């Protein structure tokens, strides 16, 4: 069809608008999960996690609606040089009602500049809040190396035999105290900045299909002028990480060894807590501290076993040994096999076991959890999402110890400490029981 002169300006404007929209297209990524569930003994879905464990087996065992919404855009590009702006807002509600208001968490807001340094081709300069090179076990939602937060860095520097990355990030915690000479008042609820300095050397090919990553993190409490720390605060600490990744059976296996000291032992993933530990809304911190060390040995992966079977797996031993005897020994093992009936329908089972020993009491808490789910997903991989699943979960536990949060830290000398289940005639931990739940859930990442 011939375009008249009158219509030509409109056609040009529309075409220009389309090209402009494509050039300025915004990247939309994210993650979300939500569903509905019931408990066999009555009421809404309960979720099961062993006291003292830092995570739980998640299939058929998530009781909240959670979402991360990421918007990003390459805002400038010239040759191989570019600037990218990235954001991430997260939400979490209890999925109990239609209208559930919550304050969003601003997780990411950063700019990444690629190839800006002529003599470091392939490297990236970045600054802002960021999820920084996180390492996790998906099936237990456990992040074992994660220094995310506000920060800055230079990453992916090619050193010939690997990629070097340097970063500094920050997290804050209650525990720092402001002192006033006139009345000697201490307010332990003030936040104290903790800085983490991270060095990583990754992508070192050491065997066919295998790579090695090494990392060192140093964390320290960074006090303002006229501030002091609670007595016995650890102040600083180190985390050393070695991770070997092997390509195997159309998937991967990761073997990880980590060792941490003092302020880096509480979370054990690279974030520092060096100012002491405050509980809830206490007016001053309980003088517990995290001086000591942590050892973690972890193996996890995901593999394909023929055309119809995929499987995730994890095995981990973690020993947090604190000078105050409030540490734990935690070991966990689990598998998640998946049988694919069609390219979009599968049956998934998850079996997981946790055992946590209290350093103080010597008692042990244990739990095993089994989930069977029928699932429809967008593809034939165990990683394919979105997925809609119906599930049934059975959990049985036997807990011999718990943490004493009776009263307050000012009145209870055992506040925050591990105690036996029947300590002082009380009831700590979850006892010896079992339960089953059932429901439906969607999960998506894009």
UniProtKB/Swiss-Prot annotation:
Induction: By maltose. The keyword Nucleotidyltransferase does not apply. InterPro entries: G_neg_Bact_CarbUptk_Porin, Maltoporin, Porin_LamB, Porin_LamB_sf. Keywords: Cell outer membrane, Disulfide bond, Ion transport, Membrane, Porin, Signal, Sugar transport, Transmembrane, Transmembrane beta strand, Transport. Residues 1-25 form the signal peptide. One of its GO terms (biological process) is monoatomic ion transport. Homotrimer formed of three 18-stranded antiparallel beta-barrels, containing three independent channels. Involved in the transport of maltose and maltodextrins. This is Maltoporin.
